Amino acid sequence: MPTHLNLPDAYNVRDLGGYFTNTGMITKHQKYLRSGTLHLLSKNSMEKLEQYGVKTVIDLRQNHEVEAKPDVFNNSSTVAYIHINMIGDGEVEAFYNQGGDTADTVSTMYIYWLENRKPYIKEVLSALASATSDTTLFHCNGGKDRVGTIASLLLSICDVPTSTIAEDYTLSGKFLMKRFFDEQAPPDVTPENYTWVDYQKDYCPAEAMLKVHKHLNQEYGTILNYINSIGVSKIDVASIKSALLG
């Protein structure tokens, strides 16, 4: 089963290991971790991640996010830090302000990134492929949108079923609840009247990721064809697959 790392000063830290593929294989633990921002990590939490095997951190946040909340591994002498501004510095809120169904809104945003930020998606995947000997952690702010998009590509490379990938995506609803109530919830929204299932429905429904995969399959034939089309080499694809499946 996938592993959640319960750190007191970081949200949504999860291992991509433990998922069955369509051929009956299981993705390996301690290869790729996905998470939210790491700027509040204590020395103890940093040590826990290093003990888990983390040797590379890939930060997918926007420039202003990195400047406002620098990653604690930015100046580490033991962990390599890579910043890739995956989505550019446009306002994410513009997508949400359009209103409408959450799955439509969120999937439209992800598809926009996948179609309009191809060089940066490629850069992220190539960086992940280059750091496969140990554990690599990739993160954004909440570990849901940018990270969820990249995680879906990694799992697709390993032939994990689309339904499972969508389920992995929705788990952010479970592990972002504390942040939601700490930082985002209106005063009248409480744990008593708003559960993680409600959050999941409002912010990360499975249907959103299913729509993304439907788009890529319709436009490119397969997810792997999309990955190849943006210039990710066969060697990099093989490295990712080997890391997660052995």
Descriptions of predicted regions:
Residues 1-137, 150-246:
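Cys-dependent protein tyrosine phosphatase-like superfamily
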Residues 142, 146-147:
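Ser/Thr-glycine-rich phosphate-binding loops at phosphate-binding pockets of nucleotides
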